[in-house]
Amino acid sequence: MIARALLLVAFAPSRAAATAAMPAPLPAPLPTPQQSAYMDTGFSMFVHFGLNTFTTSTEHNDGSIPAKAFAPTRLDTDQWAATAKAMGAYAMCFTAKHEGGFALWPSKASNYSVAQSSVPTLDVVGEFVKSCRKFGLQPCFYESPVENGHLMLQKPTPTTEQFVQQELTMYDELLGGSQYGHIERIWWDHYPYACGGLSSCPSGSFPASYNRIVEHVRKISPTTIISNGPDSQWVGNTRGVGAYPIWNYCSLDTEVSSKFCGAWSPHGPIYMPRMEGYSLQRSGHWFWHDTGLEQALNASEIWGHWLRTVGRGTHWLLNVPPNSTGVIPEAYVKQLTIFGSALAATLERPVAIVHNVSASCGPGGGSITLSLGAVVAVDMVQLREDVANTGQTVANYTLEAHSPAKGWLPLSPSSDPEVAAGGSGVNGQTIGHRVVDVFPALEGGCDKLRWRCTAAGQQEGGGVAHLASFSAHVRHPVLQ
C-alpha cells in the first residue's frame, strides 16, 4: 500500500531588489508532446537483425553480403514483442535497413531486400509492426539515410540525387500510406556526418541533403520522432552510460540546420532530449553471431545500466538481437524477464509519492518534505521535473532522510561518477525528465525524506523548481 504522503513545501523570502537588478531570464524551451511521451517512458528494446546475423563476425556490412544469405527458419516477432514487454520497454526499434542497405521489407526502390533473399515472400518489417500492435508497443525503425553500402557498390556510382531519391522512396514505403500505419520513431545512426565512414555515400551529399530528408519525413509522417536528428540526439557513447549532469537545452550546429545540436547548456534555445544505446551481449556485438561465445548481461548488470541511463534522464535503447533462426535466445529472455519483474515491483509500488509540487531554489531556498507514513528502509528516490509545462530548472539539489532516533541525516552524493551497479549515492545535480538516486537504507529506517533545490539553471522561472513527482522506494533484491 502506498502511504499517504504529508507534503511540506517551504519557500525562501523574496528579494525584490536583487531580482529587479537581474537581466530578464530566457523563456524555457519546452518539449513537443511526442518528445515528452518518448522521454517519460524511459527505454526501448533495440532489435538488430539482418544479413549480418548470418555471418560469424560481420557487424558492419558494406553491401557485399549476398541477399540469399538471409534465411531465418523460425522467425517469431511475437516472441520479440513479448520479450520487450517482459523487460518493461514501451517500444521496439528494428533495423529495417542497416548500413549495407539490405531492406527487411520488399522494397520496390531496391534490388537488395528480402524479395531477393532465401525467403522472398517474407516481409519482416510487416511482421514486426503487427507484433508491436498486438503487444501494445510503439514501433520504431532504424533506417539511416546516409547508409546504403550496396547502392554505392553499383556501377556507375550513383549520383547524390539518385542516392537521396532512393532514401526518400524508402521512407515513403515505411512511413507514408497505410501499409505499416503510424511509426512512432525513426532512428538515424551516425547521422548526418557518416559519409565516408562505416558506409560511404556520394561525395558532398551530406550534410547538404539533411534538411531535404527531414522535411520529407515531416511531410509524410509529421508526428514521427526523428532520433539522432531534430527530435532527440545521442549522448556520445555506446557504453550504457548517460551523460551527467545532463541539460536538454542546446544551441544549433553551425554546419547543419533543422535543429541539429552543436553545444549543450542550461540556457540553450532548443529543447533536445538525449538517448543512449547499449547491447545486451557481453561481446558488445549489436548483431547475434554464430560463434558460441555470445552471452547476455545478467539482470543486476542490466539494472546498473538502466540506472546510469534512464536513471539520469536519458532515453535508453537496450539491444536484444535475435539469432539466425529468428528468435531471441532463451538465456537472454530469462535475464530480461527477471530484470523487468524486479523493475516493475520497485517502480510501480512506491512507499510514498507526491505529484506537482514546487520549491524555490538557491541558498536558503525552499524544501519539500515527504512523509512515508511509517518507518521504512527506503533505499531509492525517483525525482521528475515538470518539463512538459515548465522546462528543466534544477542544477543542484540535496536529499536528507529523517531517522526517528537521530533526526535529519544527509544522503551523500555518489563517490562513483557513473553510479555503477553496486554503487550508491545521490546524483545531486540535474533532474530533467527523471533522476533516480540509490543509497544504503538508514539503520533503523526513516520516516521522512527532504529534498531541496540548491541551484537553478538560467531559464525563465529558474528560481523555482517544479517537480512532477517525488517518490520513495524500496528496491527489489535483484536491484540491490
Regions found by a protein language model. Name each.
Residues M1-L7:
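Classical eukaryotic N-terminal signal peptides for Sec-dependent ER targeting/secretion
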Residues A10-A21:
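N-terminal signal peptide
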Residues T19-G444, R452-A468, H473-H476:
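Mature catalytic domains of secreted/periplasmic carbohydrate-active enzymes
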Residues L479-Q480:
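Extracellular/luminal ectodomains of metazoan preproproteins built from arrays
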